[in-house]
């Protein structure tokens, strides 16, 4: 037994390990010595018991060969239950002074230290090293990632249910622009068609398409043939333009792609917008000179290009996208009736193929954009409703930099703590076996002049009200307010220097503050780095256009058809968005709304309106 104690004491003396858990025992021992000065025999017995506790604690210390820690890592382990004692689970401290030991055979060793205070017990696991290696830091990182993945799985399970509830906000956000577009188209068509000239032109076009009253069969055949041919030509143009866009994006010809998109936007805003502007001036009987007209159209076109393809306020960008949809819908609605119905039907069928089939051009475009983690390079209306935190690449890079800054090597070359009013009580006790253990308890009452020097020898002090935290402890304390709150009179935390070791150990309040600040910093970093944003709903401008074409064609007949078709389109879009939330994949937005709209239009025009006329002629009121 005595030989084991001698070997352990020599090991302690060689590596200068001092277990803080014994400080509490020594403190109690000193109190016993001060209170019972006359009982020397009892003091010797207490000393023997304390020395035995020292030997047992040193014997139970974990000696681990860890291949170098040059990172300073703090992370919180979630155990699933609350503990009454405040504990800092893992603090990895790398001390270069300890790495200069002559004995390299041990490599590194670990000892558990416990510091007892009046209100709490703080467990500190201190790891020393004498060689530099990245392997352990990678292991620590993988361990943290594993814990975070488990937490993310739990969070996903918790947030999976309310996601469908919050999905209603995105549905409403996409219904607003669709309704605005259709209302503007209806108002424009009703205003234009109310004039005498436009009414006469509409009658002449309808008579030409009907083929005259003489031969109704040949007129019907010609009308169907013309509508089919026009629809196929229009579909061929759509397929060609979509294929060109996919090829340009697939081969990363982004300049050509955006030049093409900008050219079409200028054509829509400048030419179609200018022509519609002339019609409105004629309808309102307003005069305008050509110079002012050109300036207005030019500013409108260039402003649209800037807002759509560059930076602009969100509402302005969405306003220009709605304007483009309105312009296209107004001109497509001027096509003959059966050509319009044929185009809407064929485009709806093609939309199913383009989005859902494996070889569809739109599906290829979507999959390519997802693989590259990029937005689809097209004029697409984005609902931009993110439930949770908005996430972008800049925030990702900043969070990664912050996470890398958390892993900083803690090099303490020199720690000098000067105390003006220090009361030192030194008690030297001799064991009966002849082994001498010197236990020193240093009680610091006033810490007025503390100085912590970094590895370059530069001093960090608080002068002229400027407080700079130690650079070796980056994320313990986040700002000056927390530094002042958890610091002594000069702005630095109250640390104590462990005897025979260059290890900083804080008192109870300082350690509690460090634990709370570190845990809150880690939790905020985890939430910023691992919280993924909710995907927003994006609807192509083509969907806006064809919805508006359908309701615009209905507006050229009766106001009753406008309301019924409007309800049918919104119902189809709503069902499509519900399916989008269920299947969680890209779905075509045209088929359900267009099919419902066409069916409701003919039912309203052939049945409901005739029924309303019948009730009105017979003066039957329901």
Curated annotation (Swiss-Prot):
Place the motif PAL on the sequence.
588-590
Q: Which GO terms describe its molecular function?
A: aspartic endopeptidase activity, intramembrane cleaving; endopeptidase activity
Alphabetic keyword roster = Endoplasmic reticulum, Golgi apparatus, Hydrolase, Membrane, Notch signaling pathway, Protease, Transmembrane, Transmembrane helix
Q: What is its EC number?
A: 3.4.23.-
User: Biased composition, Basic and acidic residues: where in the chain?
Assistant: 1-16
Region entry Disordered, spans:
1-65, 132-160, 419-477
Under the subunit heading, UniProt states: Homodimer. Component of the gamma-secretase complex, a complex composed of a presenilin homodimer, nicastrin, aph1 and pen2.
Q: Quote the entry's note on domains.
A: The PAL motif is required for normal active site conformation.
Compositional bias (Acidic residues)? 147-160
What's the domain of life for this entry? Answer: Eukaryota
First-listed, main subcellular location of the protein, grouped into a coarse class: endoplasmic reticulum
**Segments passing through the bilayer:** 169-189, 228-248, 266-286, 290-310, 312-332, 342-362, 539-559, 563-583
GO CC annotations? endoplasmic reticulum membrane; gamma-secretase complex; Golgi membrane; membrane raft
Q: What is the lineage of its organism?
A: Eukaryota, Amoebozoa, Evosea, Eumycetozoa, Dictyostelia
According to its UniProt entry, the protein's GO biological process terms are: amyloid-beta formation; autophagy; calcium ion homeostasis; macropinocytosis; membrane protein ectodomain proteolysis; Notch signaling pathway; phagocytosis; protein processing
User: Where are the compositionally biased (Low complexity) regions?
Assistant: 21-62, 432-466
Q: Which residues form the active site?
A: 351, 543
Ranges of the Cytoplasmic topological domain: 1-168, 249-265, 311, 363-538, 584-588, 610-622
**UniProt cross-references to Pfam families, sorted A to Z:** Presenilin
This protein's name:
Presenilin-A
Outline what the protein does. Probable catalytic subunit of the gamma-secretase complex, an endoprotease complex that catalyzes the intramembrane cleavage of integral membrane proteins such as Notch receptors. Requires the other members of the gamma-secretase complex to have a protease activity.
Q: Which InterPro entries match?
A: Peptidase_A22A, Preselin/SPP, Presenilin_C
Root EC class? hydrolase
């Amino acid at each position: 037994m005595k030989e084991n104690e001698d070997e352990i004491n020599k090991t302690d003396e060689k590596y200068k390990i001092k277990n803080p858990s014994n400080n509490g025992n020594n403190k109690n021992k000193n109190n016993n010595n001060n209170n019972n000065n006359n009982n020397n025999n009892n003091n010797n017995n207490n000393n023997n018991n304390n020395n035995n506790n020292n030997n047992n604690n040193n014997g139970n210390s974990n000696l681990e060969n860890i291949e170098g820690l040059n990172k300073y890592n703090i992370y919180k382990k979630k155990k699933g239950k609350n503990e009454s004692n405040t504990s800092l689970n893992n603090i990895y401290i790398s001390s270069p002074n300890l790495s200069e030991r002559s004995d390299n055979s041990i490599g590194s060793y670990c000892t558990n230290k416990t510091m007892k205070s009046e209100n709490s017990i703080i467990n500190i696991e201190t790891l020393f090293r004498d060689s530099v290696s990245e392997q352990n830091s990678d292991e620590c990182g993988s361990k943290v990632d594993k814990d975070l993945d488990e937490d993310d799985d739990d969070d996903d399970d918790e947030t999976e249910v309310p996601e469908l509830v919050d999905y209603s906000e995105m549905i409403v956000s996409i219904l607003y622009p669709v309704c605005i577009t259709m209302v503007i188209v209806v108002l424009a068509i009703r205003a234009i068609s109310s004039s005498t000239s436009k009414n006469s032109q509409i009658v002449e076009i309808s008579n030409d398409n009907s083929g005259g009253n003489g031969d109704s069969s040949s007129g019907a055949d010609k009308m169907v043939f013309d509508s089919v041919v026009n629809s196929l030509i229009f579909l061929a143009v759509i397929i060609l333009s979509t294929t060109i866009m996919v090829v340009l994006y697939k081969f990363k010809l982004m300049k050509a792609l955006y030049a093409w998109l900008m050219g079409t936007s200028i054509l829509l805003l400048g030419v179609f917008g200018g022509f519609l502007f002339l019609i409105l001036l004629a309808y309102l009987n307003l005069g305008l000179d050509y110079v002012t007209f050109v300036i207005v159209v030019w500013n409108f076109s260039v402003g649209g290009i800037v807002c759509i393809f560059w930076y602009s306020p969100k509402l302005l960008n969405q306003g220009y996208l709605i304007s483009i949809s309105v312009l296209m819908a107004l001109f497509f609605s001027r096509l003959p009736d059966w050509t319009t119905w044929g185009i809407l039907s064929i485009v709806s069928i093609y939309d199913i193929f383009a989005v859902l089939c494996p070889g569809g051009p739109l599906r290829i475009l979507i999959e390519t954009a997802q693989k590259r983690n990029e937005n689809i390079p097209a004029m697409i209306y984005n609902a931009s409703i993110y439930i949770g935190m908005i996430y972008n690449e800049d925030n990702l890079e900043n969070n990664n930099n912050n996470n890398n800054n958390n892993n900083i090597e803690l090099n303490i070359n020199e720690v000098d703590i000067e105390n003006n009013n220090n009361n030192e009580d030194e008690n030297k006790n001799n064991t009966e076996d002849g082994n001498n253990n010197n236990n020193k308890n240093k009680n610091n009452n006033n810490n007025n002049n503390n100085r912590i020097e970094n590895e370059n020898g530069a001093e960090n002090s608080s002068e002229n009200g400027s407080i700079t935290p130690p650079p070796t402890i980056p994320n313990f304390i986040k700002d000056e307010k927390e530094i002042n709150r958890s610091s002594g009179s000069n702005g630095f935390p109250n640390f104590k220097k462990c005897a025979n070791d260059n290890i900083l150990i804080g008192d109870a309040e300082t350690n509690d503050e460090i634990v709370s600040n570190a845990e809150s910093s880690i939790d905020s970093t985890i939430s910023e780095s691992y919280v993924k944003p909710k995907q927003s709903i994006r609807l192509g401008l083509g969907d806006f256009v064809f919805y508006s074409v359908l309701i615009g064609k209905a507006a050229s007949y009766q106001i009753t058809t406008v309301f019924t078709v409007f309800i049918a389109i919104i119902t189809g879009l709503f069902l499509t968005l519900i399916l989008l939330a269920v299947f969680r994949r890209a779905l075509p937005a045209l088929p359900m709304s267009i099919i419902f709209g066409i069916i409701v239009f003919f039912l309203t025009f052939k049945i409901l309106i005739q029924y309303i006329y019948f009730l009105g002629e017979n003066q039957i009121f329901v």
